[in-house]
Amino acid sequence: MILSNDSLVAFHYRTYGTFFLHKNRLHNIYRGFTHYKYYRAGNFPLFSSSLSFLLLILFKENDIIVVMEKKKLRINMLSSSEKVAGQGVSGAYRELVRLLHRDAKDQLIVTENLPIEADVTHFHTIDFPYYLSTFQKKRSGRKIGYVHFLPDTLEGSLKIPFFLKGIVKRYVFSFYNRMEHLVVVNPMFIEDLVVAGIPREKVTYIPNFVNKEKWHPLPQEEVARLRTELGVSDNQFIVVGAGQVQKRKGIDDFIRLAEELPQITFIWAGGFSFGGMTDGYERYKKMMDNPPENLMFPGIVSPERMRELYALADLFLLPSYNELFPMTILEAASCEAPIMLRDLDLYKVILEGNYRGTEDREEMKEAILEYQANPVALKDLKEKAKNISREYSEEHLLQIWLDFYEKQAVLGRK
């Protein structure tokens, strides 16, 4: 290669970045093998668009200007979750992508829904076009599937015709089997996947997390203003629940509690994310249209409004019968709302006693009255919520994801 004395050449490496050098300051060049693209900058001949060689530069101090990036992994995210508002998968997806864009830009190049080569392709939803893409010969790197649900967990959520249930189940597990590795947000899913024939070593548990810049407590004066706007006095006890309006969320118990405790204000944020496909849609719609006077249904709300509702909560209650890994619990904990739950096996594993567990509606009722009468006990429960927030912080989960992607990318090259 011939350069004029004043030519500035920029070699842009596909993975390693860019460096600049002047011919008259070049000390030594060794030949070898790597792939590069060049940009013409000055008076030098045209070359073919790619060439294989290795450029090793030995230079004196200040002789060559070098700007070189450390090799980055390319992670391509595939997700349609944000097409459906008010459900946890979209929230978990956006939190992960936002965290990686913000804090892992030195290690990763993160793209979304692009038909490109990548070190890792991360499937967040099980769309049929994504399923078909797993059969294409083009390089997608290591295929990682995110398991947010199992076929059985759809019971009580979506209204699926009986004759389709078997087809849906086979499709879901076929999709998961197309993946080279699976990530579960619920550790209880691991055994179910193993029973379905997926090797245990092919599954990794990585929990959800939330952004503390987005989900945080509000000042007391702001809470007082919100109570005034809502028409609720300072000493009125408020119980907040959140999630899709579905049978499995325990919405029936939440409504019954409001009926049995007229002196307590109840608020349920959420709606029908899947419209008429929601199991029990007509019945729950009638309930929402005619709630008890002390029960409010604001519907699907913005994150900003949801943060305000968590701030209003004297107690956050999620009476679900079946859960995956609810983002609402992490959001409420990050906003320092005391948390009461139906005592599912999942919570015993992931929350380790940092909540008030209840077995049924009667225990929930007794606990609400107990906390209304005992501010000290409520304050203790609030401190436990802070423990949840620390355990599922961004800082803790960021390194877990970086290590996971690095390991999977290495396996994908073998």
What are these regions (language model features)?
Residues 242, 265-282, 299:
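Glycosyltransferase donor-sugar binding loop
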Residues 163-182, 285:
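Membrane-proximal helix-turn-helix segments that form the acceptor-binding/catalytic region
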Residues 321:
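Aromatic "clamp/platform" in nucleotide-sugar-dependent glycosyltransferases that forms part
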Residues 280-304:
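Nucleotide-activated donor-binding/catalytic signature segment of Leloir-type glycosyltransferases, i.e.
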Residues 300, 308-313:
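Short alpha-helical donor nucleotide-sugar binding micro-motif in glycosyltransferases
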Residues 227, 233-249, 255-259, 267:
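Conserved donor-binding/catalytic core segment of Leloir-type glycosyltransferases
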Residues 338-341:
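Short hydrophobic beta-strand element within catalytic cores of glycosyltransferases
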Residues 353-363, 369-376:
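Conserved acidic donor-binding segment of nucleotide-sugar-dependent glycosyltransferases
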